[in-house]
Amino acid sequence: MASKNNIFDIIVVGAGPGGSFAAKASAENGYKTLLIDKELISEKGRYKACGGAIAWELVEEINYPEEKIARVIESLELHHVDGEHYSKKGKGAVIWRSVFDKYLTDNAIESGAIFKEKEPLISIHKSNDTYQITTSKSTYKAKYVIAADGVTSQTLKYLKWPYFRSEDLILTITKEMKTSKSYIDKFLGLDTVHLFFGIELIPIGYAWLFPKTETITMGWGNQINLVKNSREEFDKFASLSFVKEALKDSEMTIYKPHLIPVGLRPKLYEDNVFAVGDAGGIVDPISGKGIPYAMMSGQLAIESIKTCEKRDKLDKLGVIYERNLDKKFLKILKAKRIARDGIFQNDENLKKFLKLWETYRSSQIVMRNLI
């Protein structure tokens, strides 16, 4: 049984960007809020496989301290394997997810959310309009649950929600390569991230080199049902002459495979449970960018609860949540998912997209039917 102290209005499972932002919004709106994570975060944060590039607008929006930024970025270099090259200007930041996520979790705690870490979920079930969540350490109850525990969400697995289609999943491999700051500055540039494309290299996806302070985050991602041998395919990227030169004399400190959704989960809401961020597949299908959409979806879940309670329309909660998502950004992500198949159909289409991407945002390319 959950003690009185363990009864909440809203329980958020997963303290990534989506979960922490939802917990912050929940606490700020006066809800008794519990944020749970299976990992230990309070000391140094926890490692997440992620390139870690975010837009400067997001840095400013959340007042992210500049001393926590691993590298400020001013441009994006797009390499096609046949030698063609494209450049895109735009200010951004490369961050370590351990540091970034901890900052957001700390913000949620400061706003009044209760945080429980190192508590993996063991079970979840509903009884009399209340969800009972059991972790490795305790049992908690709440009316609403925010599933923010990633693409392989245990919350939604226990609730028997349908999983993603294989064509909506990207398998990524990330290697953290330790090197010197001076070599990164000299070879990759002081303020540049590098992306690599080519249907022969990666049928539906891309690879990347994201410089941090003294580390290059090297990554590769391909649609999972097209992957035959991930190590061989990753090594094909690693053997490109530019990549070999960038990583010479570097030392691997982390190797991590990871899944990224690039299409929506078949449902995003059911019976007072919300899927946010990667758990719902709320990710840019072309770039794989997920951090801002996770944060916005977490906040919109809370706003939807507040609106429906105020108007006494809790029966419309799922409709309101998806309508809010559509208005903010989901309509564009859905259009991008359709466009993605055409972009990666052949190298001609891919290059046309890369050329347009130099000048336009990917959302403009898709919504204006430029491709």
Residue spans for each PLM region:
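Beta1/beta-strand and adjacent pyrophosphate-binding region of the FAD-binding site
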Residues: 2-18
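Glycine-rich FAD pyrophosphate-binding loop
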Residues: 11, 15, 27-48
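Conserved Rossmann-like nucleotide-cofactor binding loop
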Residues: 18, 41, 152
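N-terminal FAD cofactor-binding segment of flavoenzymes
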Residues: 40-76
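Helix-loop-beta segment of a Rossmann-like dinucleotide-binding subdomain
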Residues: 77, 81-96, 132, 212-224
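FAD/FMN-dependent oxidoreductases across multiple families
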Residues: 94, 121-123, 224-304
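Predominantly flavin-linked oxidoreductase catalytic cores and closely associated redox partners
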Residues: 109-245, 281
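C-terminal helical "tail/cap" subdomain of flavin- and related membrane-associated enzymes
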Residues: 306-371
